[in-house]
Amino acid sequence: MSFGGGRDHQFNRNNMGSTHGDFRGSRGSDRNSYNRGNDFRGGRSFGRGPSRDTRVDLVAPNWDEELPNLPVFEKNFYQEHPDVAQMSESEVIEFRKENEMTISGHDVPKPIRSFDEAGFPSYVLDEVKQEGFAKPTGIQCQGWPMALSGRDMIGVAATGSGKTLSYCLPGIVHINAQPLLSPGDGPIVLVLAPTRELAVQIQKECSKFGASSRIRNTCVYGGVPKSQQIRDLQRGVEILIATPGRLIDMLEIGKTNLKRVTYLVLDEADRMLDMGFEPQIRKIVDQIRPDRQTLMWSATWPKEVKQLASDYLHDPIQVQIGSLELSASHTITQIVEVLTDFEKRDRLAKHLETASQDQDSKIIIFASTKRTCDEITSYLRTEGWPALAIHGDKAQNERDWVLAEFRSGRSPIMVATDVAARGIDVKGINYVINYDMPGNIEDYVHRIGRTGRAGSTGTAISFFTEGNKSLGAALIKIMREAKQDIPEELRRYDRGQYGQHPRYGGGRGGRGFGGGRGGRGFGGRGDGGYGGGGYGGGRGGFGGNRSRDQGWRR
């Protein structure tokens, strides 16, 4: 079966917005496209949609009537490699056991063991090999054959397991087999993600691996003006990565449509449901033809996610990597210190002194509230530490700048609320410090999962107070499973008598550092950095930076 030919030549165009997209101009199509006059929001075509101030309620089409009028599309592109075909049943079982794979569903394809066995066309395979990966991750070994086969599928795997490429690369193959977009068409691939940070990270992967196919994408999320996102959508994109709320906005004001979507991805489905996006997800999915291919990815498998899968996936196959029990990576050293709120500041300073001995260290410090986040940052900057803050009250351009400074190592300490717990993929994070414990054990696992990724080692330090006692039993269970040393002070919380279920039990956050003075900045960089006292002063905003050879502190 053909993977589809190369895409028509297009000129490159830089995206000047904040989404880092790669837009290559609109293209005429020499392939057949179905009639775009019927826009399932009430008969109005995309080009003649409602005015910017007019919203149209999204109503699910009558698919029994609509589906027979839609064109048939290809979605099974999997060609089993001869070496995979020769694997015996016992070899398949042993490989899955070694990689901690649990499989469910019927006619599940055999796993692949190398990139060459995946069956990707050369234009995809070459991009992968250029990245220098040694071999596929466990979720990719089983996920690629499942996704390429056109089946609805569920992948349950921890953050950092390589799941983005598990659906991104098959999505590129899927796009290249479909008719080209015509003016007014919506995307072919839709990826829903819970946060803008995760959405932007997904977009970077799509841009990188879709470049050779000239596949266009954009990222749609809240917190920034709609204008650039609308322009991107109106030019036409094959891949749309979106947070549910902003996508609903775009659909209701007629700036895009989902008629062409035949490949739907729900990434971090558990997180989207935790954040209350279930009504928006259902409203969005109801707008998409039911014979699409749907891929659901999740780090956990609670009953709410199971119900969503039951409602929207048809005869799915599933791969689970690791135990269904919540667990932390064994490459992370977990250190828990039982103390009082008033002891936190001194302990934080001591750990930073240790971490800063490695000039290449990157550290994330998690706080429970935006206020505490800013207070920690202000204190650290006053003491000469190169710290910046990121949380939901920061403007998007400031958040992007902070992440860029952190990634580059120019500001190796980032203080964050849980907005950064998922979706931020920064390589080389050595330390995670939970200044405040999170509200539930899932967030603890996701927080510390920022370090120890892709086989590297990392350290997670957590400050545990009496106010966190409802997390004690669950925390000890996580540490025992990962074979970590449990301090005697923590063992007394190893009882199920504190009233709250560990999933929902939350301790109160720390009290912060009081007011704190504004950070002093860290000198001006010769390359035109944000020098001086910083943009945002005591709130940990755009401070200047010291060059790496000057060390971390003043």
Curated annotation (Swiss-Prot):
Keywords: ATP-binding, Cytoplasm, Helicase, Hydrolase, Nonsense-mediated mRNA decay, Nucleotide-binding, Nucleus, Ribosome biogenesis, RNA-binding, rRNA processing. Residues 1-57, 496-554 are annotated as: Disordered. Residues 144-319 form the Helicase ATP-binding domain. It is found in: Cytoplasm; Nucleus. Residues 334-494 form the Helicase C-terminal domain. Its EC number is 3.6.4.13. Its main location: cytoplasm. InterPro entries: DEAD/DEAH_box_helicase_dom, Helicase_ATP-bd, Helicase_C-like, P-loop_NTPase, RNA-helicase_DEAD-box_CS, RNA_helicase_DEAD_Q_motif. Residues 1-11, 21-30 have a biased composition (Basic and acidic residues). GO terms for biological process: nuclear-transcribed mRNA catabolic process, nonsense-mediated decay; rRNA processing. ATP-dependent RNA helicase involved nonsense-mediated mRNA decay and ribosome biogenesis through rRNA processing. The Q motif is unique to and characteristic of the DEAD box family of RNA helicases and controls ATP binding and hydrolysis. This is ATP-dependent RNA helicase DBP2. The gene is DBP2.
